[in-house]
Amino acid sequence: MLSWEFPPRTVGGIAPHLFNLSRELVKLGVEVHIVTCDFPGAPETEVVNGAHVLRVDSYKTPSPDFATWDSLMNVNMQKETAALISSLDCQFDVIHAHDWLVANAAVGLKHVFRIPLVATIHSTEVGRRNGLHTDYERMIHQTENWLAHESWRIVCCSQYMFGQVRWAFGLPEDRMTVIPNGVDVSIYQKEFDRAEFRKRFATPEEKIVLFVGRLVYEKGVQTLISAIPKILSRVNAKFVVVGDGGMRDSLTRQVGNMRLAQKVMFTGFLDEDSLRKLYQIADVCVVPSLYEPFGITALEAMAAKTPLVASNTGGLSEIVEHDNTGTKVFPGNVDSVAWGVTRVLLDPGYANWIKLNAYQKVLQVYDWAKIAKQTKEFYEQVLKVYDAGSWKPT
């Protein structure tokens, strides 16, 4: 598996996806090697839950832009992975690339070693940007398109992404499959002093409204911030915003201009243990995304038995059933978000109903063991075609 992020480097949803998927694949007897980017303090090589992890130099010398840095990182990733493949007694069966950031290395390795390449497209640039407006965005789109067409098969995390990838890259349906993301329910079952931990974020009288995600436009946090006055007019609440990103300064100014600094806490990134606990003490988790290929934050809230308010968009629409496993609101609509949050906070019976239903859905559909089994079967389908063809080296 090739990915630019893997714990402790966690930028988005790919890192936890690989961490959990690799663990469960190992349990099924799959030998997993993960090649990823280095991170301060993390060892160059280690075994994590049975998966072999190799971290390659990310070229920390100054680069003119992120794309140049990524290209340099891919050069080293391809070189180090090639050395790894050559040093092993056994041949890798499949190369699994995760998103465009590792496309150059993945495609190069595919052709050098004649190993089938598959890719998980976690999101698309045209979806993230609501179109392609700059040369930089078009470059990313073209790289995604190249990776998609070089791959034997494509994995999408939702039916929504299946449709978007097919539309964006013109792929036939028989080269694509849907395997959802998952969540580890067990981490939300550890006991801790909830009252003591809660003091870090709110007073006993305040309800906790939680947002977790990158502070970028498509995640819709600006909609939630704008809805705060309407929510506070009916409920005494504290808004905890977990994550970082390019919009943090503007959001902080927005909160200051609204004179709500005492009601909004920007935590930045939190360690996994603190985030797990925060999900469990929150009274509601809000996922107000404008664009969302899947919505791992929604799954985490459901696994923690936290009532969920989510935008009716993208993959979220498949995860959340309105009035059953959560409350759906219109994306980008301040009044709708305020209504959804207020409804959950003012009706404890309703909140309890949706959170328990959501938890059961997680157990039935989004268990990592089931997802790993689907992934292994997907690999076996690819290998069956590969073994029957003429591309395999003799």
Predicted regions span which residues?
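N-terminal subdomain of nucleotide-sugar transferases
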Residues: 1-52, 387, 391-394
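Short hydrophobic beta-strand element within catalytic cores of glycosyltransferases
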Residues: 307-310, 320
